[in-house]
């Protein structure tokens, strides 16, 4: 195969210099600046293998097939051009000169043999030559087929010989009568281009057929017999023949020069034979090239037959590539119609795929196509990214990021679900909740899943940022138990702790009730230590009790013997059991005359909490905290529970624990009470708690004495945090302050996002609901308190006061004294400032007086709630009721100019006042409602007229009064509404 380097470079889309340089590296002698250098098979294969890697899939194979086809026609094309220029007549010597290239020499000798045998007897010569060609080298095979092709062409006349022997005999016998005469003239032109174009001006095709077919034809003639019998279908060969149009197109310009008349006569005489030729081509499916060449020759010779159609198909494609003469195209158009009928669906699909592949490769082969492809890929990538973002966004919309202890209303807002449905779901799982009650993590998960949401707790997400430390078993030592005292308000929790600690904590609590979580360390006479947590009993402190149960080891549930098991007691028991905390029941106040401990045990048994006295597993002790009865026995039972639990911790590691309370101390800054649960907390440690962080500057115990370190189960008060962490947050000791700051900032960001999610924008539905209610009002509050737990409890209680007509909004809550910024916020939002055990600063008080902002300060949570209730009642619009005071009958009417209609009436019942409102009724229908214009008794004005007397009156803004009308007098009474 001899190919121009430039042609291959154009197909591979590579510079000629690059190809030449590559060949020189491989040891071939190639000129760098000569694009017309011809390369052989070996060089072609190397180049296609090297530079075909970057081509699209299937492109390299297409290029290989293209040049394999061209190799059959290109050598012939060169001589054909010479023939045209020099003349067809007597330039055999010149054509012979072209044979000089070494590649062509073997063909030349073989062709010479063909010529000598041709003029003599065409029929016997193929028989002799076929074995010779088979014995000869592959190049020799190329020459032999030329004659065989001429014989194969007449095979189309085989119709009369449809019997089994038709395959060998028709091919050889039929050419004898017609073709020997025709073949002789054909052979003469072949002799002129002896080198390779043996055949008439069409020489290119014969040569194309010459290269591969001889060996294949030999096989054909042997195999075709069987193939023809087995394969009668005409579809497959046609499709393949169509693919090999390239060869015939080269010779399209020389068609008129060849002896087409003889071929036409054959076609006219034997139309059926042509169809059989199609079958032959199909039988030659194995030898694609030969079939294409044969059909190509016939197509050029024939003007409009069945053979022509197959040849024309071969001509159509090359005609487009090499710009053939218009005559060839016309023939192609004519002949392209019949084959369409025979093409199968598979062929059509394959053709479409090839066409699309060719189009796409053309695009990529140009720089413009590359740019378009790049832009298309970029668009696809952008669309995929947008689709992924939409999927991710839809997932995020169904994922709730929240913290534990979210209220029912906040949860409903985040899910955009009516509050009633959330409450109904909670009731279905056995929980009686209110709109502002806080839910724990487990309940939130259940409710969210019910509505198709996933929950992601912010706290859990951020705890993962801190790698947990694993403790070795040998490093663990026993630690004191953490005991929480829980129960109903005024049942004696703090009194019990006082008795244990020999102090008087109650005197320090406003109103004698506990409003903070107190943490106290206690050393018993036996030397063992216990850490006590005292939780508030008031219903507002639900979250506080939940936190107390979360960090405790043992719970003492205290119940007054002279009272019942109260709601807060039940709630405390539920918190403890939910946390899996063992409980010890202390029945207090047994010194009182009305004490009945057995009734308490019975009520506990009804709740499925059987005490040991009644055969259950829960320990109980009857005590009197005030008089110190049985306190020691209670502590022994607590220590027994602790021994069963085998509480251990590792003091030789960084500390981890929980925030119990946090507050703002004017002299010391933000102060936090923490419970160390594991490890040891030292002075100077970097602490991260919630969104707050800092380095510990000082530590104090519960008696306000400075300490330098705190071990497991030890409560301490720490200074140094940059804010007041939320009660219940976990604190961790980190290595660097930078790490703590980064995590704290991330937590703060998530907390802010949750606040935005919870904030619900007013919708049209809300507006219409408010208009339906009529006088809808909002009460905005700013809550400031001394400790975080109290602020949270108070805020929840105030929000719970909301009604349909008045909505209470806590727009800001914080720890610390009331500052100027609080006053500015209150002025901007028309809010009232509530201070719980805090006072405003001097500047804030002056600012409040200037701006007209009301500041209320309280020390007891009950007082705060009652005051806000009364304020809300004052905001309610009063209820208006009508009270009928009397009725009159119109006896006679008089019309007076400038005054209007005067009615003379008799008071039937009650009395009519000058200030009363009246209603004019005619035939039972109210005609007018308004006020009296005047009321007279004779000629004097009267303030009121009682029953049985006559009077004269006129109605303001109405003169439509008739005899017999009834006038009803009534008063409107405003009745104050209550919550």
Curated annotation (Swiss-Prot):
Pfam family, one: IF2_N
GO molecular function, one term: translation initiation factor activity
Segments forming domain tr-type G: 478-646
Disordered: annotated segments: 68-386
Annotated GO CC locations: cytoplasm
Composition bias type Polar residues, residue spans: 317-326
Comp. bias intervals (Basic and acidic residues): 102-179, 217-229, 260-273, 347-356
Cited CDD domains: IF2_eIF5B, IF2_mtIF2_II, mtIF2_IVc
Region (G5) residue spans: 624-626
Chief place where the protein resides: cytoplasm
Designated name of the protein: Translation initiation factor IF-2
Organism phylogeny: Bacteria, Pseudomonadati, Bacteroidota, Bacteroidia, Bacteroidales
Gene: infB
